From Swiss-Prot:
Keywords: Neuropeptide, Secreted, Signal. May be processed by convertase egl-3. One of its GO terms (biological process) is neuropeptide signaling pathway. Residues 1-26 form the signal peptide. It comes from Caenorhabditis elegans. Neuropeptide-like protein. Plays a role in behaviors associated with a sleep-like state induced by stress (SIS), acting in concert with the FARP (FMRFamide related) peptides, flp-13 and flp-24. Transmembrane segments: none annotated. The keyword Ion transport does not apply. One of its GO terms (cellular component) is extracellular region. This is Neuropeptide-like protein nlp-8. It is found in: Secreted.
Amino acid sequence: MSQKLLPISPLQLLFLQCLLIGFTAAYPYLIFPASPSSGDSRRLVKRAFDRFDNSGVFSFGAKRFDRYDDETAYGYGFDNHIFKRSADPYRFMSVPTKKAFDRMDNSDFFGAKRKRSFDRMGGTEFGLMKRSAPESREQLINNLAESIITLRRAREAESSPESQRTIITYDD
């Protein structure tokens, strides 16, 4: 009556269970290696819970799925910056992401947010490059150029350490 219920011994079954637990615990490190030399894993599909960024009942103030190791603070070797898995920087690789303000020269004093607002402005003298410009277009363009030069000089004066102060008085 005594038949073997399992084709393997209980010790072998325990060993297989330990291997299975070890593989499932190492699975995130297998698909996202910590060092960039161990493989290019940036284009791999993320798991569902990796798409949530600090979401959940017990995640108040906690980074739940971040992996800490010696190389970087978040376990990824992506140029030493914080890599948020919920916002993959390679998701728009096939779509051109250059905007109009990206094509402006680097010597321009506008910051990126100012450039975005510069592009969105309409109905002002910044919209002079449209074809429906009025007759006094050259005068308005000259006024705009003068105001930009004045703004650049003001910015240079702000960035210079303790230069001459300008006092403006208004006479009534």
